[in-house]
UniProtKB/Swiss-Prot annotation:
Coiled coil, from the record: 47-75
HAMAP family in alphabetical order: GreA_GreB
Record flagged with keyword Coiled coil: yes
Physiological role: Necessary for efficient RNA polymerase transcription elongation past template-encoded arresting sites. The arresting sites in DNA have the property of trapping a certain fraction of elongating RNA polymerases that pass through, resulting in locked ternary complexes. Cleavage of the nascent transcript by cleavage factors such as GreA or GreB allows the resumption of elongation from the new 3'terminus. GreA releases sequences of 2 to 3 nucleotides.
Residues spanning the signal sequence: none
UniProt keyword terms in alphabetical order: Coiled coil, DNA-binding, Transcription, Transcription regulation
Name recorded for this polypeptide: Transcription elongation factor GreA
Amino acid sequence: MTEKPTYLTREGRARLEAELEYLTTVERKQIAERIAAAKELGDISESGEYEDAKKAQALLEGRIRELKHLLSRAEVIDEDQASNGEVRVGSSVTVRFEDDGTEETWTIVGSAEANPRQGRISNESPLGAALLGKRARNKVTVHTPSGVMKLTILKVR
């Protein structure tokens, strides 16, 4: 089975690469030093310091594996490429909600960069998936866990 790509902006890929670099060169060393210091204290079978450091190490290694996996599947979005007016990953989309007339603008990004509070929604979310392939003036109905949303696309950039 082929895995889906992880869509990332250039900035998002750089951010994940920087995090991976920091975790593997700085954080990993600090945790190894904590483990060594706890071992020097003597009996590690009842050492809270040692247990805490080992838990931190396990969490760190899990995050490192996750980042490596994300980056190995990364497909960088060319945000400068013309979308021909169609919503795609990397597009900014302005919509109007039919129920109250309010407008919002979102950027469609891959799930690794999604942050709805910052206006960045995942292409895999119900809203993001419903917008993909649509154009300005299209009406869209989105089925979400909290109910049905009806909106009109005003602008695609």
